[in-house]
Every structure is written in C-alpha cells, then in structure tokens.
A protein has these predicted regions:
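Residue-level recognition of single "structural anchor" positions
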Residues: 1-184
Length: 184
C-alpha cells in the first residue's frame, strides 16, 4: 500500500507553494498484484498527525505494509502501524517516489479540474468518493457493473439529437432480464 497527502484548489493571489486556500487531501492506494486494487481519497482538516491517525483508523489495516514519504505528520499519525515504511522521495529511485499513489492523485486532480471546471469545497469529498469508487471497480467482473457499463455505453448525447426528435437508442438484444423476487 502507498499513502501520501496533497493539496487541491487554486493558490491565493501572489502566494507560492502550498497556499492556505487549498484543500488538504489524504490518499492511499492498495498495490495489489495484476493491476487490481483499490484506493481511498479523503478531505482533511490538515496533513497533521491527527488527520493521518483518523485516516489510518478509518481506512488502513494495521497488518498492511504502508509505503510513504518521510513527512513527520504521517510518522506521528501512523506510528501504531508496524508496517509503515517511510523514505525520502528520490527521483532516481522509481519505487521510492510512490508511483501508484501519485498516479491516482494526478488522475483525481485531472478528473475534478477537467470535469467540473471549478471546485467547491462543499462537494469535493463527493468527487473524491466517486473517483475512489471508479478506481476500485475499474476491472470488476460483477454482472451488475457490466450491465451499468453497457447502459452507459448506449447513452446518446443530447447534442447529437434534434430537440424534436423521438428516436431512441436501440437496445442490444443481449441485455439480461430484470431481477425477480421469489414468491412475489
């Protein structure tokens, strides 16, 4: 598992680095074999030990091996996790740079900044939950997920249909039958 913190949002005018108006976020990614795995992204008050302690309590397993950078807040917050391995970030060592969690963070930032064109702190946790859910279910073989995916692919954008058109997208013949309740 890899864990890291990051900030999202716009910087204050003229400010450099991590601006105070940015929202602190915490992220963890399960480095499961064969590309499967899950992630969790959470809004936090700050990136201190207290925030990491709560994040660890809610989302991490004490038996996990957690790879992280050498941030002191993480050291204090996750001190009860025996599998915590912290290293200084080294650009020459690809594994020490936490590639999985940084890829998820980068994809999350692109997702919210590209799809929503502006962030609302009020809705940011919902965006994080959506991104985490999509990442965690990206290779699901669940029948319900497959059906949902197929239905999304059948969607015809309104921009491609005239306002007065009554044409509906043709449903494929292979859609599963609806679920029925036994004894009803």
């Amino acid at each position: 598992m890899e864990a890291d913190d990051f900030y999202i949002g716009t910087r204050a005018q003229g400010a450099r680095g991590r601006g105070t108006e940015q929202q602190p976020m915490l992220a963890a990614v399960d480095r499961a074999p064969a590309g499967r795995g899950s992630c969790v992204i959470r809004c936090a008050e700050d990136c201190s030990g207290g925030s990491w302690r709560q994040f660890g309590h809610d989302h991490l397993c004490h038996a996990s091996r957690i790879r992280a950078d050498a941030w002191s807040g993480m050291t204090a917050g996750l001190s009860s996790f025996r599998g915590l391995e912290q290293k200084e970030c080294d650009s020459s060592d690809g594994d020490a740079s936490l590639p999985m969690v940084h890829r998820v963070i980068s994809n999350f930032k692109a997702y919210v900044e590209g799809a929503f064109h502006g962030l609302s702190k009020k809705r940011l946790q919902s965006y994080a939950d959506s991104c985490s859910w999509r990442y965690s279910h990206r290779s699901s073989s669940d029948a319900c997920m497959e059906l949902l995916h197929e239905m999304c692919l059948m969607h015809v954008p309104l921009s491609g249909i005239a306002a007065t058109a009554t044409v509906q997208p043709k449903l494929p013949a292979s859609l599963p039958k609806p679920f029925t309740v036994q004894g009803a």
